[in-house]
Amino acid sequence: MRKILHIRSSIKEENSVSRKIGDDLISHFKSTDKVKVSERDLVDNSVEHINPDFINAMANNNQDRLATSNKLIEELFENDIIAIESPMYNFSIPSTLKSWIDNIMIARKTFLYTANGPEGLVKNKKAILVLSKGNIYSEGAAKPLDFQENYLKTILNFIGINDITVICAEGVDLNAEIREKSLKQVEQQIKNLSI
């Protein structure tokens, strides 16, 4: 049985494109494979931003203060597939997701610095990025403004996750026709996806 960690970050709990696509993805896997899904909703259960207390706790090995970070890292290692939902906010990701990233990007836990450069420790995992974007960012004048997809891929690669599938609905806020076309493409992509 494959284990999936389903991470949600959209502040729109209803009418969220990324949440709808994420739900469709999980439903697809449940209907075609034996899977166990754990959900981490970063809006309903927000992760504390790192701060001076967090840095001091790391320096002093204060496990009480690091408990949340340790739990989030444990979830990464326990699951085979990490499905991350992210709408694009201000050309990037929601702050809730950034806080999660800051809590899992911990040297000697999810990556090491070696003589040959950084080495990711979260190996043999697959990631699925479930992205939504109000505009078209894959081409044209807005392309250089997309700090969402490449950032998430870079983070995942850095910690050792190199098998990454991107499911992206673009232009969902432009007009109904573009939105519908994009959602149909995503629907087909999900149908063709296996784990």
Curated annotation (Swiss-Prot):
Cofactor note: Binds 1 FMN per subunit.
Binding of FMN, residues: S10, S16, V17, S18, M88, Y89, N90, F91
Catalytic activity: 2 a quinone + NADH + H(+) = 2 a 1,4-benzosemiquinone + NAD(+); N,N-dimethyl-1,4-phenylenediamine + anthranilate + 2 NAD(+) = 2-(4-dimethylaminophenyl)diazenylbenzoate + 2 NADH + 2 H(+)
EC number: 1.6.5.-, 1.7.1.17
InterPro entries: Flavodoxin_fold (IPR003680), Flavoprotein-like_sf (IPR029039), FMN-dep_NADH:Q_OxRdtase_AzoR1 (IPR050104), NADH:quinone_OxRdtase_FMN_depd (IPR023048)
Cofactor list: FMN
Membrane spanning stretches: none
Pfam families given in the database record: Flavodoxin_2
Domain of life: Bacteria
Functional summary from the UniProt entry: Quinone reductase that provides resistance to thiol-specific stress caused by electrophilic quinones.
Subunit structure: Homodimer.
Protein name in the entry: FMN-dependent NADH:quinone oxidoreductase
Naturally occurring in which organism (per UniProt): Francisella philomiragia subsp. philomiragia (strain ATCC 25017 / CCUG 19701 / FSC 153 / O#319-036)
Gene from which the chain derives: azoR
